[in-house]
Amino acid sequence: MNFSKLVVRKMPAHLQKLTVKSKTKVKSLKKNEYYTIIPETAEQEKVKVAIPIGKQIRVRQGDFVKRGDQLDEGNFDPHDILAIKGPNALHEYLVSEVQEVYRLQGVHINDKHIEVVVRSMLRKVIITDSGDTSFVNQQQVDKFLFDEENDRVEKEGGSPAQGTPVLLGLTKASLNTESYFSAASFQETTKVLTDAAIKGKTDNLMGLKENVIIGHMIPAGTGMKKYRDIEVFKDLPGDLDWDLAIGGRGRRSFRTFRVGSCFHCHTLSTCCRRGRG
């Protein structure tokens, strides 16, 4: 099992390049000094990890530790969790930590509200290998754009790009959005608008915030483009029963109907499905 870091509250610089291929064993342990990690394979050398003064140790002599295990008390560094365990583990950790703060005060919040914020914090990817894509190494791109570009290149038989997920703070996540209207309304308005003007950016108004600023309908519910031209048909006896009988497809049809017309034959006369006049 390969990994480049061990989880410690403050990681010493010499441990950041450590690579361990299997489980490690805590052999020698002395409080307030250090503990030695001995890999099971002979390829790796012994590593001494300093113990921060005043920290409670979570392992004992002879214990086996593996990738991502916490060696002393304290909070995890979110960047270490992202590098070692991946974005899914970091997502769960951040949601859990935020919920713990609210629950201690007797406040109950649905996870989905926090998950929306965390998702925006983990939406960017740093390009490590551009492959045959249009990206540049060390470029920070949106995760969805990254996947879309890789799919296009793979269909053409090219080499996809490689990237590393990055954790952004709330401020940076808000300023790095694709919409410059949304970014300018948050912070650094002059800088954001000047940068957008110099680069000739185009805002496609895909999100909620930018549409509210402009005064357009938000792209949600009946505000979505595919629902804007629909006319609601007149409710008549049997309409709901027929709609449920066909699995609700009638009310989700994206055609324009006349009031009182049949969803199947679009006539105002006898319905072909129900024999109704």
From Swiss-Prot:
It is an enzyme of class 3 (hydrolase). Its EC number is 3.5.1.16. PANTHER family: DNA-DIRECTED RNA POLYMERASE SUBUNIT BETA. It catalyses: N(2)-acetyl-L-ornithine + H2O = L-ornithine + acetate. Keywords: Amino-acid biosynthesis, Arginine biosynthesis, Hydrolase. This is Putative acetylornithine deacetylase. It comes from the Bacteria. One of its GO terms (biological process) is L-arginine biosynthetic process. The gene is argE. Pathway: Amino-acid biosynthesis; L-arginine biosynthesis; L-ornithine from N(2)-acetyl-L-ornithine (linear): step 1/1.
